[in-house]
């Protein structure tokens, strides 16, 4: 079968190779891949900045945002059958089986020794087929086949917002207005989720208000703001207060500024990564005073557990019902497996690249 691989630590190593098709073992399903989303992690692996090959292998099959169709079920599998649409979760428990991994929450792994499909120590899904234990397979309705690769990134945001709401159970809290920083895939999915929850949502990004990203955000009823026209610091007075802010750019000054700008008793959810490790000048006293005196909270979120994937399925159906075609509009670049390396070279106008395997 065809598979898209990288050599971790080696820049621009992405390539298509032939591999033996995996065989389905007991308790597993063989999945024929339909499509795979491409994200920044895949690009960073190809840049040699990240990624870990499976033990005994010098390459890594990339891709962790895949939807496919069950082709074969192994012995003991009773909850799925050939023809079912499925998505596999990404993170696997650490070998030490820490408390959270034993509790089916490897996204909160205590040791950091977890494995991740297509990222850390396990081959991913950017291939014609993969096998997976039923413990990590989520079923989707057939109508989500063409957008199912969005479930994994959506589950990450779903988790972050769920955890933010859980933190806010510390008091009586009725959020009305949200600010999302960033209009990449995570930012737009956060916009959709918060709009689906009934909040007034403002999405701030660098592209012009006539850009595809702006149009997609506004289809959901959000207000798109070009940061070149309205800087972040001006937004609370003009459009706020913001009860929840989701930071999805990875630009760390925004993360810390959000802690100052969020409403009294509000919460900031940090979903963007900052891999460049740059130093920035900040008024740390200002941030601390604001957080303490106004009872604010901030939390980070990464990966997701099974319940977030399952909630994500319901969320995608709700978004699909309210705004038909909205999820599909995120796919602005499509490639085949043979041309998959091109999917890792996105422009600033691209929202989401997807590799269509079948």
From Swiss-Prot:
<dbReference type="Pfam" id="PF16912">
    <property type="entry name" value="Glu_dehyd_C"/>
</dbReference>
<keyword id="KW-0862">Zinc</keyword>
<dbReference type="Pfam" id="PF08240">
    <property type="entry name" value="ADH_N"/>
</dbReference>
<keyword id="KW-0521">NADP</keyword>
<dbReference type="InterPro" id="IPR002328">
    <property type="entry name" value="ADH_Zn_CS"/>
</dbReference>
<dbReference type="GO" id="GO:0008270">
    <property type="term" value="F:zinc ion binding"/>
</dbReference>
<dbReference type="InterPro" id="IPR011032">
    <property type="entry name" value="GroES-like_sf"/>
</dbReference>
<keyword id="KW-0119">Carbohydrate metabolism</keyword>
<feature type="binding site">
    <location>
        <position position="41"/>
    </location>
    <ligand>
        <name>substrate</name>
    </ligand>
</feature>
<feature type="binding site">
    <location>
        <position position="152"/>
    </location>
    <ligand>
        <name>Zn(2+)</name>
    </ligand>
</feature>
<comment type="similarity">
    <text>Belongs to the zinc-containing alcohol dehydrogenase family. Glucose 1-dehydrogenase subfamily.</text>
</comment>
<feature type="binding site">
    <location>
        <position position="39"/>
    </location>
    <ligand>
        <name>Zn(2+)</name>
    </ligand>
</feature>
<keyword id="KW-0547">Nucleotide-binding</keyword>
<keyword id="KW-0479">Metal-binding</keyword>
<dbReference type="InterPro" id="IPR013154">
    <property type="entry name" value="ADH-like_N"/>
</dbReference>
<protein>
    <recommendedName>
        <fullName>Glucose 1-dehydrogenase</fullName>
        <ecNumber>1.1.1.47</ecNumber>
    </recommendedName>
</protein>
<dbReference type="InterPro" id="IPR031640">
    <property type="entry name" value="Glu_dehyd_C"/>
</dbReference>
<dbReference type="GO" id="GO:0070401">
    <property type="term" value="F:NADP+ binding"/>
</dbReference>
<feature type="binding site">
    <location>
        <position position="116"/>
    </location>
    <ligand>
        <name>substrate</name>
    </ligand>
</feature>
<keyword id="KW-0560">Oxidoreductase</keyword>
<feature type="binding site">
    <location>
        <position position="152"/>
    </location>
    <ligand>
        <name>substrate</name>
    </ligand>
</feature>
<dbReference type="GO" id="GO:0047935">
    <property type="term" value="F:glucose 1-dehydrogenase (NADP+) activity"/>
</dbReference>
<dbReference type="InterPro" id="IPR036291">
    <property type="entry name" value="NAD(P)-bd_dom_sf"/>
</dbReference>
<dbReference type="GO" id="GO:0070403">
    <property type="term" value="F:NAD+ binding"/>
</dbReference>
<comment type="function">
    <text>Catalyzes the NAD(P)(+)-dependent oxidation of D-glucose to D-gluconate via gluconolactone. Can utilize both NAD(+) and NADP(+) as electron acceptor. Is involved in the degradation of glucose through a non-phosphorylative variant of the Entner-Doudoroff pathway.</text>
</comment>
<dbReference type="GO" id="GO:0005536">
    <property type="term" value="F:D-glucose binding"/>
</dbReference>
<feature type="binding site">
    <location>
        <begin position="183"/>
        <end position="186"/>
    </location>
    <ligand>
        <name>NADP(+)</name>
    </ligand>
</feature>
<dbReference type="GO" id="GO:0047934">
    <property type="term" value="F:glucose 1-dehydrogenase (NAD+) activity"/>
</dbReference>
<dbReference type="InterPro" id="IPR026583">
    <property type="entry name" value="Glc_1-DH_arc"/>
</dbReference>
<keyword id="KW-0520">NAD</keyword>
<feature type="binding site">
    <location>
        <position position="65"/>
    </location>
    <ligand>
        <name>Zn(2+)</name>
    </ligand>
</feature>
<feature type="binding site">
    <location>
        <position position="64"/>
    </location>
    <ligand>
        <name>Zn(2+)</name>
    </ligand>
</feature>
<dbReference type="GO" id="GO:0019595">
    <property type="term" value="P:non-phosphorylated glucose catabolic process"/>
</dbReference>
